[in-house]
Amino acid sequence: MDFLFNTNAQFFIAAYLIGAIPFGLLLAKKYAGVDVKSSGSGSIGATNVLRVVKQSNPALAKKLGAATLLLDALKGVLVLLFAYFYGVSEATLWGISVLAVLGHCYSPYLGFEGGKGVATGMGVMMFMLPLETIIALVVWALGAKFIRISSLSSLTALGALIVASFILHPDMAHAPVIIIGFVLLYKHIPNIIRLFKGEEKRVV
């Protein structure tokens, strides 16, 4: 158990456990009285919170969706900030980033189920690769405006971020970016299937 006293290990554990907090599920249950895991797409993320709560309270849906998006984005950044000011290596920061996303997508509080990782991934990437993330957010915003399908906008933005990271930082180790990208892509497989079938719902 000596590894638990290792600083890096402590940050890794914190990143996973904090990343695993299902803010969307908690907020929707407390303030709207709905279980997003058994409604809509079953995801705990901001999009499903907005979609499910909107059916009964559109004004509240926007507030809870925004709060979920913000909290999911910040939960990985919080640990990164502590670790950064503690002086850990860049490799450790990337490890924290990956584990925060894994925590959100495979939460031990939810039987290792979870969300799709978009907001949490966006948060850690904004910290680690800010310019690439800004490019991805612009792509996402354009997709949201013209396509109006959340999953397709997110996947397009993910692709833009990965490509931008190779162009702007060709010499960096891209393994963490690829891992996060793969996890997000894997979690979106049901959405991709619905896209091909023309069944994916739009979120306005």
Swiss-Prot record:
Entry keywords, A to Z: Cell inner membrane, Cell membrane, Lipid biosynthesis, Lipid metabolism, Membrane, Phospholipid biosynthesis, Phospholipid metabolism, Transferase, Transmembrane, Transmembrane helix
Assigned EC number: 2.3.1.275
Family to which this protein belongs: Belongs to the PlsY family.
Function statement: Catalyzes the transfer of an acyl group from acyl-phosphate (acyl-PO(4)) to glycerol-3-phosphate (G3P) to form lysophosphatidic acid (LPA). This enzyme utilizes acyl-phosphate as fatty acyl donor, but not acyl-CoA or acyl-ACP.
Annotated Pfam families: G3P_acyltransf
Pathway per the UniProt entry: Lipid metabolism; phospholipid metabolism
Membrane topology: Multi-pass membrane protein
GO molecular function: acyl-phosphate glycerol-3-phosphate acyltransferase activity
Annotated protein name in UniProt: Glycerol-3-phosphate acyltransferase
Cell membrane recorded as keyword: yes
Subunit structure: Probably interacts with PlsX.
GO BP terms in the entry: phospholipid biosynthetic process
Reactions catalysed, as given in the entry: an acyl phosphate + sn-glycerol 3-phosphate = a 1-acyl-sn-glycero-3-phosphate + phosphate
Superkingdom of source: Bacteria
Transmembrane stretches, start-end: 8-28, 76-96, 122-142, 166-186
Source organism (scientific name): Sulfurimonas denitrificans (strain ATCC 33889 / DSM 1251) (Thiomicrospira denitrificans (strain ATCC 33889 / DSM 1251))
Claim: Transmembrane is one of the keywords in the record: yes
Leading EC class: transferase
Subcellular location: Cell inner membrane
First-listed, main subcellular location of the protein, grouped into a coarse class: membrane
GO cellular component, one term: plasma membrane
